[in-house]
Amino acid sequence: MSSGPARALTYPLLVTSGTLAVVAAWVPFADIDQLSALAVVGLAVLAYTAYRGGLAFGVFPTGLVATGAVRGRRVRQQYRLVSRSWLEISSGDRMVWQPVFYEPALSTLTPTDLELTGRSIHDGNTRFYPSGRVRTTEPTGKLVDNPSRPADPPAFGIARRLILDLQPAVGAPLVGLLWVYVMNGGLGAFIGATTVAAATFTWLSAIRGSDPS
């Protein structure tokens, strides 16, 4: 089974596009200060998405220095509202944790020999795409192991993933209130700031490699 970027990266890129669409939708109604804020948000989303994409495709180093065949397994991190997939990689007496974008093959991955090239991570024909830099210490929170026996990969729809990634957006109204207070805006400014903040929080969860499992 081959895993291309279409499967692992489609969801975060769709959320990125949706976030930029929300930002663009408020441009016609923005005054000069609001327009400047929207421009900053839009540029930040584009820049950070490009950086994460660079990590995923090996353009930027993730800090994973081992090469060749190494022992690895998948663990799922659960910390507060954060859920991410990590590859726990053993190389000699050293262990590191590499975050990766979720794809269904991760849910059934049993301890195996991973092939590292310095720019990519493979399990046979399946490629895993890094969603951040490697850690040399165990990720914070609860780490859940995969089942010891492989099963059919689960299917998680976009709706489920959006619902999970929307959880951090509960703080968006506070951003809206702060914007109204600082900029002396009205109801329209509050609604605009709240929706942009909610979209941005959702995007940040997705682009950091959220795990719907």
Identify the function of each model-found stretch.
Residues M1-P61, G157-S213:
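Alpha-helical transmembrane spans
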Residues P104-A155:
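A membrane-cytosol interface segment of integral membrane proteins
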Residues A69-R71, W97, D113:
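Well-ordered beta-strand positions in beta-sheet-rich domains
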Residues T62-V82:
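Structural detector for short beta-strands of small beta-barrel domains
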Residues R80-F101:
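OB-fold (S1/OB) nucleic-acid-binding surfaces
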